[in-house]
Amino acid sequence: VEAEVLGFLPNWLVEDAAVTIDTDLLSMLAFHGVEASGDGRLVTSKPSGDVPDGWQALDSEAFVALKAQAQADGVRVVLTIQRFGWQEGTLERTRALLGSRRDRRALAERIAQLVSERGFDGVNLDFEPMPEDLADEYVELVREVRAALDAVDAELHLSVDVVASLTGYDLAGLTADDAADLAIIMGYEFRTDGAQVAGSTAPLDDPEIRDIVATLDEALALVPAEKLVLALPWFGAAWSTETEQAPSATMSGRDIDGGASPSYAEAVAQASLTGRQYDAAQASAWTAYPNRQCATCPATWRQVWYDDPDGFGAKVDHALGRGLAGVGIWALGQEGGREELWWTLRHRLRPQIDETPPGGSASIDPESIQGDLDGRDVVEGVASLRLFASDTPDGSGLALTRIGLSGDLAEDGQLITGRTYPASERIEFPLADEETGGSPEAGPRSIHVQWRDIAGNWSPPLVLEVMAVDPTRSETPGDL
């Protein structure tokens, strides 16, 4: 599949992204970024006199090396120019900039000069939010940037970021022949920290709120599909909730943990402790666990929602299936060195027949073993598992782990009774949970462990024999 794959690289994640970034899959890398002021300048110093973080990262050895390698691998590296108006007073400066023809042109010329001096392959404009009464002025700015770039090199690329509501953005004008090459729809933050009901920050299809399907319906009625890229989140959302079920109302208060946006890696780490569930309509994984901010604080549940290989893959499929130019990622580095989202992207863009399941080994963490009884490791309420799994060299890559206390299999090869987890090296598995075949009674347990790859192949289960001496003694940790 020939598709644009745009990876946003925030200045604070340059070193993290360098660990796993796959330049073989990326077509465009957007360094995020340099701020535009309200009077047509590029902000080069903070009020304190310090150099802004974006400029520091721009000059860092890590980014210089990453940029050079990406361009050598054929990736277009562009510079994001940002202008945020979400905080009090900042939107007025956006109004001042867009309302001044002189300042717009000055900014366009400065952007083109910086791109030329630093050897970038284009520009990504991230102006948000966009008041509806400034839609025309923003189109004019984009045209002026296009003209300034063309004066340097007509091959320089130009894209614009658009918030998911689409409010204030004239998509047709922004992507006209004399304007941007692409509009990047930010397909996330449909739910934010203040959401009343927990759920995906990027729901594919959700009858309760605006979602990706509805957003693309609206956008495709305005511009051709090949002008659009759908950016997807490599981060999640967390709330305190009334129940462990979905949907659940969120809770707030002085003694209750508020909403948060954990990275993909942080969300996966939590699901490795408390299990992974999946909402097929929203195309999002989630996990829930009991939570209390302090010893005397109210008891709540905590829900964490995130896109794992299944959710991310479903949204990539949807975008490409509707003919979009491609997909984007916010943000590189949030995967924390994990590779399964990259594997998912590869499997979607370059699918190969994969009918071979992954394989692996499993053992009980020696530090959690209380002794030996009748040849079985003695454990208490939770089995701390060490897992080592891999897919075949030509396989689609690891996606999930499933663990249960019964070996009965469904037609697709997965354990009928069990709990699903991310494909992690360490998993905490409770032995008293009846939903997984457990019991509060002490006695022997047969722990069945299997893995699934991104193509959907389940491995035959491995079996660990343990003796549970106090199954009810278990803790479900969490801190997101």
Predicted regions and their residues:
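Active-site groove signature of glycoside hydrolases
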Residues: A108-E137, I185-E189
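Conserved, mostly hydrophobic/aromatic
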Residues: L29, L125, V145, A183, ...
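Acidic/aromatic/glycine-rich contiguous surface patches that form carbohydrate-binding/processing clefts
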Residues: G311-I353
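Glycan-recognition patch characteristic of GH18 chitinases/ENGases
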Residues: V1-I111
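Substrate-binding surface in catalytic domains of secreted glycosidases
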Residues: D39-L58, M130-A267
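Glycan-binding loop/region signatures in secreted carbohydrate-active enzymes
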Residues: E92, W234-K315, H347-R350
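Low-complexity, disordered linker/stalk regions enriched in Pro/Thr/Ser/Gly
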Residues: Q352-L480
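Short, acidic/polar
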Residues: L9-T23, G99-S116, S165-L174, D307-L320
